[in-house]
C-alpha cells in the first residue's frame, strides 16, 4: 500500500505540492488567530500602560508594599518581622505569575540624630533617616567621592552615601565622621561617614519608580544587609519601616489568563490589609479595564476571521472534489480489480495523513511569520517601520493548526466515500448519462442566501433607526456575528445565482453568433455551455467568493482608516492649529498670582452678568495686544496661514426664533404664586435666543487655502459658501439646527457675547458640517451646541479684539518636526498646538484599529493566495484531462495556435467573467454591509459620518494580485501544453 501511495504521489507531484501549499496556508491562517490575537492584546495593554506612565509619571508595572514595625520590640524581633514580611510579599508576587523586572527591598530608621551637631537655626539637632536598599549600587552614579563598603570598618565606622539634596536637607558633609543616636534613647551611639554623593543613573529606571528626591529627601543610604544585621544588633538603629517593591515587566506579560490575575490581585489587597501591610499596584485599574477592552478586541478579531474560515472550508472542499474527480477513474479501476472500499479509502487517508503531518509542522511557524509581518501594518496592505508585534509560539497555535488538518482530512475523505462505491462500468455509464441539477439548485439555495441576508440587513437597520430615535445606544451591535455571516452568505448567494444562469447565457451567445464564431471560439462556448454541472462552475464560484471577499475586506479596511483620518482632519480643520498668549495689563497683573492662559481669561469674561462688580465687568472689555501675525508666515514648511477666531456660549437671538426652553425640575419648584400673576412688561421685544452657540469667524479668502474638508459633507462646494461670506460681510452661516428654531434664509439675527454690544447679521446659508466645528459638541444643558460662521473683519469691527487661533497649511512633504523647531526659534510660545498628522498617527496606533487592519490584511493575503492556488489547480487538472480532446481537435485540422486561443477564450469566459462579477458583487456587498462596522467604534456620532468610499489604490492592489495570478497561470499552462506529446494525442484522436 505504501509503495502504491508514494508512486501515486510522485506521479501527481505538482498536484500534491499545490495541495500542500494550500493546506499550509489554511493551517497558517488558523494558527495566526491565537498568535495574532494574543500579540495584539499584549500591544494594546503595553500602549495603555505607557500612556498611563506618560500621563501620571508613575511606573505602571510597580508592585509596591510597605510595613510599619512596632517601636518597642528588640533587634532580633525586628529582623524576624522584616524577614516574615519579605517572605509574605515574595510568595504573593509569585502567585501572580507575572514576569519580574526587578526586586527591591528597603528598610529605614526615621528617628536618628547627629550628636553635637545643630542645624543652621542653632536650636535643634540634625535629624535624618538611615536607609538600606538592595542593589542600590547598580542603579546610581557617584558624582563625588566613592561608593560605600559593606560592613563596619576597622575604626568602627559605617560608610554611607547620600544625594546632594539630602545633604543640604540634613546639613551633613562628605568625608566627615558623625556620631549618631536614637532620638528616644541616646545612651548608645554608632559612627557613620558619608563617603560619596550620588545621583540616579537612569531617570527612566523602574528602580526609582516612586521617585528619589520626593521619597528619600533626608535619607542617608548604607548597605542593606549591614543595616539589617550589624546596625540593628547595636541597639542604636531600629527598623521603623520596611518596603518590598517589585517592578513587573509588563511588555512580557502573558495575556491568556488575565481574568484570574485580576481576581488574585483583588484577593491580595484584602490579604495585605488583614496583615497590616500597605499595598498598591498602579496598573490594577488598567488591567481591569483592559480585561473588558481585550474581550471586545478578541471578539472583533474572531468575527473578522469568520469569512476567511468559511473560505478556507470551501477551498478545502473544492480541492478535494477536484482531486477525486480527477482520480475517479483510477478509484473505479481499483474497485473492479478486487480492492475493498477500506483499502481504497486507506490509500487516500494515508495521503491526507502525510500532508496533514507536514502541515502541522510547517503551518504554525508560517503563521508566526505572517504575524510578524502584520505587526508593521499601518493600514490595509500598508506597512511601516514599526517595532514588530511581540509574537511567540503557543500551544493554542499548534492546536488550531491540528484542527485545520482534521477539517482538511475529513473534507478530503468525504468525496472519496461515494467514489469507492462505483465500479468501472458504473463510472463509464455515469459519464454518458445526463447530469441532474445539483441539490442547491433544486432547493434554490442562492435565493435563500441572498433573501435571508438582505432581510436581516433590513431588520438590523430598522432596529438601529428605532434605537437612535429613542436615544438608545445598541451595545449588542459590537458583538453581533451575524453581520459577518450575512455578508459572506450574500456573496455566496450571488455567486450561486451567477453560475445558475451563466450556462444559459453562454448557450444563447453561442446560438446568436454561431455563423460568425471562429472554430476556437465556438468550441470554447460549447464546452462551457455544456458544462452545466462541471468544474468550470465550481471555479467561477470559487473566484467569486475569493475576489469578492478581497474587495469586501479592502473596502472595510479603507472605510475604517478613512473614518479615522477624516475625523482627525475635520476636528483640527487644517494641518496645524496654534494659539499663543496675548498680553495686556490685566493679564500681566493676574499672572503674578495665578497664571492662566489668554483663552481662559477670555472665557471668564464671557461669564459675567450685570449683577457682578464693576471690576469684573472690565474683564469683558479688556484690550488685548495683537502679536505680529507675519511671524507665522515665515515658519518652516508653511504654505498658507490664516486667522480664525472661536468663541463658545455666544448668544444668537431673533424675533422669528422659537427655541425650546430647557426646563428643569428646579425651575418648577422655584415658581411662586406671584410668578404666575406677574404682569410686568417683557423688555425682550418678543425675541427668543440660544446661548449654546459655537462662533467661528474667518477670513474667507485665506480660509479656503488652509482648511481641510470633504466636499461630500455639503450640498455645494465649500468655496461657494466662502464666496458668499466674502461678498456680503454682515452675513452668517448657521448650523442646520437653527432651521428647527424657525429661521430662514435672509432672516436677520442678533449676536452678542461678553461685554460687547450686540450686532446684527443676515442668514446666508444653513449647513450640517463646517471645518473644525462639531455638531455633536455637548452644551451645558446636556444637548448639542449650535454653530455660526461669520466674516472675521466684520466681527472684528463690531467687537473688541480677542485672541484668535492661527491655522496653517503645510507644504507637501513638509516635516512637522522642522515646523515645531521653527516655532521655538521664532520665540513663539504656544499655549496649544495641534497637528493633524500627529493626531492621525496616534489614531492609527489605536490597538483596535491596528488589530483590525492586521486581521483584514491577513485575511486578504490568505484569500488571494488560496485564489491563486485554487485557480492553478483547476487549470492544471483541466489541461491534463483534455489531452484526448486536443488530439481530436488537431486531427480535425485545428492549428496549435487555435488550441491556445481556445484556452485563452475559456479563461476569459470563465475566469475573466467570474473576476469582473466578483468585483461588482464585492462592491455591492461593501456598500450594504461595511457601514455596520461603525457600531464597533461607536461611530454613530462621528464627524464626518461613517462612509464607504472605494479607493482606487485598493483596487489597483487587487488588480495587481489578480494580474499576477493570471500571468502565473498562463506561464504554467503554457509549459504544460508544450510538454503534452501532441503526436500521441494525435494518434489517440485518429483512433
Which sequence ranges carry the predicted segments?
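C-terminal transmembrane helical bundles of large multi-pass transporters
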Residues: 804-806, 829-922, 926-931, 939-945, ...
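Juxtamembrane segments of multi-pass membrane proteins
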Residues: 465-472, 477-488, 493-720
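Alpha-helical transmembrane segments, especially those used as permease/efflux helices
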Residues: 14-19, 25-32, 36, 260-274, ...
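Interfacial "coupling" helices/loops that link adjacent transmembrane helices in transporter permeases
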Residues: 12, 40, 314-356, 422, ...
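Membrane transport/envelope proteins' first extracytoplasmic loop
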Residues: 2-313, 322, 376-384, 394-397, ...
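Short cytosolic juxtamembrane segments of multi-pass membrane proteins
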Residues: 420-438, 940, 976-991
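Alpha-helical membrane-protein architecture signal
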Residues: 2, 342-346, 350, 437, ...
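Small-residue-rich transmembrane alpha-helices
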Residues: 273, 317-320, 329, 353-385, ...
